[in-house]
A protein has these predicted regions:
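Aromatic-lined carbohydrate-binding/catalytic grooves of carbohydrate-active enzymes
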Residues: 40, 49-52
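Residues that flank catalytic or metal-binding motifs in active/ligand-binding sites
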Residues: 50, 59, 110
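Short, flexible helix/strand-to-coil boundary loops that buttress conserved ligand/catalytic motifs
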Residues: 45-49, 56, 67, 205
Length: 354
């Protein structure tokens, strides 16, 4: 292993959260580096399904200091999002260290030691910005399905060609599930969409009639941990997922998708719904979200579900350790490209004043 490098602050992750944190650290004149495990900025976006478009309009997708290109109420593609992040890093000359995946973070005296396979680092402060969506989550009974049924997670889904012709069950009725279900239906599949109705925030209509301002104000200020309705929404979102934004339940029904209750388990190798019905399907697409994966952080800062204890991203009892980009960290927008900047600014200011 080469000589250890020391920085005042290290940001782990070069996605939207890490770049936003880097922007404010650069404004402060900090000695810092952004470590990312991929060889190219935006890889996480490029690896999503082919037709994916952001669930929020372009005018709400800018990081601090650089608006997202595109007209109002235009929903950018996932590749446009990736290109934007890459351009952002170049514009602000952010010190990205690609191909540097940290596999261990631990305390070392009054600093933190970070280790990768080829390099060791030390830092007074560490901002973990590895994203809200890490390891695909499946129900425990997924393995009980008949092996003849094709299974894949939304993380691995790219396009309908991966899914055999016939009947498809999409499990999870959030944004990803609804969008994938609509695409499969358009491609000629017979589709069931299983899951709880997560509600709908009509971004299209709000943007059309009010320039989108009430919509963004709602999801970034009202639906935050600072309001009673926001705290209630936080608990709901963490359990059931975000409300639909671009698509809605009416779109699903009009497309001819059959809406089904939540999945209860497996019976005789077939998906079993909560109403007692079993479905005879050829494929299942699990749009069941992601779970946190922080096994590489060797610090006692997590609850029983592997979620870090924090107050607005500040980890109590671990001076100098912070998170940015967590799911509903402070608001419904916390993990979105257009929302991470607010939390990144708070964290970097807090760190500077500590």
């Amino acid at each position: 292993m080469s000589t250890e490098e020391f920085y005042n602050t290290i940001v782990i992750g070069g996605g939207q959260a890490g770049l936003a944190a880097g922007y404010f650290l650069a404004q402060q004149g900090q000695n810092f580096a952004i470590l990312d495990g991929e060889s190219r900025i935006g890889t996480a976006w490029r690896q999503r399904w082919d037709s994916l478009r952001l669930f929020t309009p372009a005018q709400f997708n800018g990081l601090p200091g650089m608006p997202f290109p595109g007209g109002d109420n235009y929903f950018p593609s996932k590749d446009e999002a990736a290109d934007y992040l890459e351009s952002y890093a170049l514009k602000f000359h952010l010190p990205i260290r690609p191909d540097t995946k940290i596999d261990r973070l631990e305390r070392d005296g009054d600093s933190y030691r970070l280790s990768s396979t080829a390099q060791s680092f030390k830092a007074k402060n560490v901002i973990v910005a590895t994203g809200a969506y890490q390891s695909p989550q499946y129900p425990t009974f997924a393995a009980q399905l008949d092996p003849e049924i094709c299974q894949l997670h939304s993380f691995a889904y790219r396009n309908p060609d991966q899914v055999p012709a016939g009947r498809v069950l999409v499990v999870g009725a959030g944004n990803s599930g609804a969008e994938i279900g609509l695409e499969l239906r358009k491609a000629g599949r017979e589709v069931w969409l299983s899951g709880r109705d997560v509600g709908h925030i009509p971004a299209n209509q709000l943007g059309k009639y009010f320039g989108g301002r009430p919509y963004w104000w709602l999801i970034s200020h009202v639906l935050s941990i600072d309001t009673p309705v926001g705290r209630k929404m936080q608990a709901q979102v963490r359990q059931h997922g975000n409300p639909l934004i671009r698509s809605n339940r009416k779109d699903v029904l009009n497309a001819g998708i059959q809406v089904a209750p939540r999945l209860a388990g497996v019976q005789a190798g077939k998906p079993l719904l909560q109403d007692g019905r079993t479905l005879d399907v050829d494929a299942v697409v699990w749009s069941t979200g992601f779970r946190p994966d922080y096994q590489w952080i060797k610090l006692p800062i997590f609850n029983g579900n592997g979620v870090p204890h924090h107050e607005r991203g500040v980890v109590p009892g671990a001076k100098g350790l912070y998170f940015v980009g967590l799911h509903f960290q402070t608001a419904l927008t916390s993990a979105l490209i257009g929302g991470v900047g607010k939390d990144a600014q708070y964290i970097t200011r807090f760190m500077q004043n500590s």
